[in-house]
Amino acid sequence: MSKAGGNKGGSRTGGRGGAGSSNLHVRVKKKAGTTKESSRRWLERHLNDPYVHKSRQDGYRSRAAYKLIEINDRYNLLKKGQKIIDLGAAPGGWSQIAARIVGSTDENPQVVGIDYLHVDPLPGVILLEMDFLDDEAPQKLMDALGDKPDLVISDMAAPTTGHRRTDHLRTVHLCEVAADFAVSVLKPGGHFLTKTFQGGTENELLALLKQKFRSVHHVKPPASRAESVELYLLARDFKG
């Protein structure tokens, strides 16, 4: 349930063109009996990804930082003083971005993240190391935040099996659980952002969101690789 990326920084850093470019292309040599071809291709792509390079330069925990930055640049979801819950927070990027934009501090934390994977401490973020699917997780999140959230964000994705439909169904299930949580805790006027995969089985989820929010649509930020089936569902203006 860990997040595929990390974030931090001001509300309008990075942006669509912020990844930069490099003429240096890294090739990963194949050694017989050591590296699977698929793993070699992934590593080579990762090493040559401009968002990966920029995330290191900017101090973000991973390239997915730019996904939230780009979505926020377009839709202005994050605002000073908001309270945020981050589901599937590892390695901490989205919590990092949220904390900086809303002005969360250790003295007055306004961001709570949860993941069963360990997340290194982040300024202004309360981190719960537990599975969001555990029965007690929702209440622990609310107790830690101390108020209803203005925004619930989720970059959760089930571990991939290599079977596209299976991966899609498992991730959609996480989306549904996250959506059920969001509609049970959000403040009126709040927003919900969640990762999903293309696959055409989200009808029930979309129906729920359209019933509960005034605006629902898919978003694919530039930082999401073009060849990836990854999408984000953005539901805005919770009816309460």
From Swiss-Prot:
Which Gene3D superfamilies does the record cross-reference, listed alphabetically? Answer: Vaccinia Virus protein VP39
> Where in the cell does this protein reside?
Cytoplasm
Q: Cite the Pfam families for this sequence.
A: FtsJ
> Is GTP-binding set as a keyword in this record?
no
The UniProt record lists the EC number as 2.1.1.166
Q: Where, by residue number, is the active site?
A: 195 (proton acceptor)
Q: Which domain of life is it from?
A: Bacteria
**Main location, first listed in the record:** cytoplasm
Q: Where is this region: Disordered?
A: 1-40
Show the ranges annotated as biased composition (Gly residues): 1-20
Which residue windows are coiled coil?
none
Extract one GO cellular component term from the record: cytoplasm
The entry marks the following residues as binding S-adenosyl-L-methionine, namely: 92, 94, 115, 131, 155
Q: What keyword terms does UniProt attach to this protein? A: Cytoplasm, Methyltransferase, rRNA processing, S-adenosyl-L-methionine, Transferase
Gene Ontology molecular-function annotations:
rRNA (uridine-2'-O-)-methyltransferase activity
Question: Which reactions does this protein catalyse?
Answer: uridine(2552) in 23S rRNA + S-adenosyl-L-methionine = 2'-O-methyluridine(2552) in 23S rRNA + S-adenosyl-L-homocysteine + H(+)
Keyword check for Zinc-finger: no
**Family per record:** Belongs to the class I-like SAM-binding methyltransferase superfamily. RNA methyltransferase RlmE family.
The task this protein performs is described as: Specifically methylates the uridine in position 2552 of 23S rRNA at the 2'-O position of the ribose in the fully assembled 50S ribosomal subunit.
Query: What HAMAP family does the record tag this protein with?
Result: RNA_methyltr_E
Q: What is this protein called?
A: Ribosomal RNA large subunit methyltransferase E
Q: Which gene carries the instructions for this protein?
A: rlmE
